[in-house]
């Protein structure tokens, strides 16, 4: 609440917060049309970062033919479309960032595949191979860089998110609790 209050007072473009061990990043982005701050889910912020990071790597000619984007099986399919757009193979792993870390190690030890980006829906992503766990510090830096990049183009991060949906298609999310819905699923 305090962060949003300060953001409104300062007319900030975004609000960022990490958890105490700085491995998850929470994001609010400003919608300039309504003036409201919109919370991004982990799927949204991760997909937005993936698209931005890969677009910058592509512009620099740094996406190898064996580039891979890694996600957990519960992560949005939006990132599948992002990976495909940039010519990267999508690798799905079990839930838990340790499996993304294991995929990085596998790529390094076998020489097959080059890690480009990894994410899971629970607000975690990893931009490089310097770690084997999610990292909100590098995600914060990259998201701020993305915000500046889009601002130069006259866009907010929310505008960039909307543009992603227009480019790749929108995705909806529903969390089901088995004990509440099992009768309806039969």
Predicted features, each with a name:
Residues 1-167:
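Phosphate-binding chemistry for phosphorylated carbohydrates and sugar-nucleotides
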């Amino acid at each position: 609440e305090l962060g949003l209050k300060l953001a409104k007072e300062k007319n900030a473009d975004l609000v960022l917060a990490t958890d105490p061990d700085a491995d998850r990043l929470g994001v609010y982005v400003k919608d300039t049309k309504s003036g409201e701050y919109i919370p991004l889910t982990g799927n949204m912020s991760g997909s937005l970062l993936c698209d931005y990071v890969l677009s910058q790597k592509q512009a620099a000619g740094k996406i190898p033919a064996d580039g891979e984007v890694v996600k957990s099986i519960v992560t949005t399919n939006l990132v599948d479309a992002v990976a495909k757009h940039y010519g990267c193979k999508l690798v799905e792993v079990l839930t838990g960032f340790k499996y993304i870390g294991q995929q990085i190690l596998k790529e390094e030890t076998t020489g097959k595949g080059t890690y480009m980006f990894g994410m899971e829906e629970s607000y975690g992503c990893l931009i490089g191979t310097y770690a084997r766990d999610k990292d909100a510090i590098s995600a914060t830096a990259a998201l701020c860089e993305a915000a500046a990049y889009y601002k130069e183009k006259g866009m907010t991060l929310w505008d960039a998110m909307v543009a992603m949906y227009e480019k790749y298609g929108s995705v909806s999310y529903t969390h089901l609790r088995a004990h509440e819905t099992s009768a309806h699923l039969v």
